[in-house]
Each structure stands twice: as C-alpha cells, then as structure tokens.
C-alpha cells in the first residue's frame, strides 16, 4: 500500500498542517479527519493529493471510513486544553480517549498497523521536581486531559500486543511554531505571548513566571514524525519529545522582547489549579531511536513565528 494515503487526524490544526506540508512535499497521498473545532481549513493547501473529511474522531463509523485504505495513521486529534478537560471532563473524554479507541478499532478492522500518537508530558504531573523526566518517571496525571492521554497509551500498547498494531507513542512537551492560533483558548503560551507583544497588549502570567517548560519547534517535531512513519520497527514504549532544556516563562518573555524589540507590561496573576510547575524532557530515548535534526534555538524559532 505504498501509494495508499496517510491519515492525519486533527490535520487542520497547528502540528497536523505542518506535518501535512512535509508529507505532500515527500510525494505522499494524505487524508485528513478534522472537525474544525480548533483547526482551520485554511491551514491546508489546495492539493489534489489531499482528501479532507470533516468530522470528529468520537464518531466511530466516520473514523472507520477515514482509516479504510490507509497505510498509516497519525493521531493528533484532541481537545488540547487542560482547562477544557477540567471544565468538561465528559465532553473532552470523547475526543481525547474514545477517539483513540475508535482509531485503534478501525485500524484493527482495516488491517492498518502503523500509528503515531500524540501523547503529552502532562502524564508526569508534577513529578519532575525541576529536573528532566525520563519515560519511566512515575505517572501522576493531574487533569482529565492527562489521564485520557495516559489511558490512550495503555490501550495502544494493548492493541500492539493483542492485534499487532505498531504504535509510536510520543509525549510532546511544549511544541510551538507557525499556525499556532493565539486566539484559541487551547493555544500555547508562546503564540499568545508573541501576538500580544506584536500588538503592544499587556501580557498575563499565571504565577511568578519561574515555572519552566521544555519548548520544541514544530519543524523539528515534523522531522521526527516523518521518520517514525517509515522506520522498519517501532520499539515498544513512549518517547519524550523535548530538548532536555528548561526555559522559565520569565526567560521566554525576555527572549520575545529581544526578538520583537520590546515588551508590553507584564501582569502576574494567581497560579491556576492543575498547572504543572516544572516540565523538562530527558530525551535520551528520542536521540537513540531517531535522527534528531539540529535543534532550532529559541530566538530563531521565535523570529520565524513572528515573521509567519
């Protein structure tokens, strides 16, 4: 099925659309399943090799139709918001867990084996203590979003053992880059901060700003996902996707100011329930399994984002 399409769920979103550009450039056929709740049809190119299906991964029959005839699946679709999962755990569970189960079942029935899954560093909770967490760090999900991601990982490994699926599970840390919509309530901190800096609007920081994140540029992630589609064997076990480098929000703001020529006023608000204090990836397994491209440095990535 070398000419068969690659299905990307959530493909109209930030990460998915960047991946699709790269897949089309490689000559692949691509199929997208996206309900456009946060993704945008305008993120996708007008290309005869791209088939778009509008709908949710929570719709089992639609997922079955989308998976049929594909050679692999990249499962990115999710309600990617900690706060949304806290406010509506039942609703977000449909996309964030039931959607994964629907993908697994559709793949089993269609005989499709390779699946790339976007899990999250949120599965570790606050177990980092400021240091880099490896994949064996005890899991302590603090929110329904994190719990759904961890449960999805377990189901994917079950389908590996029982039905021969080949899941490549990636625990994304903080991915950023072009097309990350700053107006979305689910957007990442970098896109929100950079947009407000460009417009001269005050920037709100929850807490003291010394909380840290491991930021990873989207083009570097796309390179890894492309490799994972084609490696002969997908080894068992999730893989952290990060740089093993922690950046505080205060340092991030300083970098944005340096790249954009200045910062508007910064207002500190009370820390939010469920927010993780420190998050940094031990990426030894990533470097062992995949060819890591030269990492995009923060200020270079910010400059690309600001000019996009």
Regions inferred by a protein language model and the residue ranges of each:
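N-terminal Rossmann-like NAD(P)+-binding domain of SDR-like oxidoreductases, especially those catalyzing
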Residues: 1-173
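Hydrophobic "lid"/C-terminal helical patch
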Residues: 19, 225-229, 253-256, 283, ...
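Conserved beta-strand segments of alpha/beta enzyme cores
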Residues: 29, 49-51, 166-168, 202-204, ...
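Conserved mid-core alpha-helix of short-chain dehydrogenase/reductase
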Residues: 62, 102-106, 215, 220-223, ...
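Hydrophobic pocket-lining residues that define ligand/cofactor binding sites across diverse proteins
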Residues: 107, 160, 197, 205, ...
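Glycine/proline-rich active-site loop of Rossmann-fold NAD(P)-dependent oxidoreductases
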Residues: 150, 175-191, 201, 206, ...
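Hydrophobic alpha-helix immediately C-terminal to the catalytic Tyr-X-X-X-Lys motif of short-chain
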Residues: 151, 155, 159, 189, ...
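Conserved C-terminal active-site "lid" loop/helix of NAD(P)H-dependent oxidoreductases
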Residues: 218, 250-251, 269-294, 300, ...
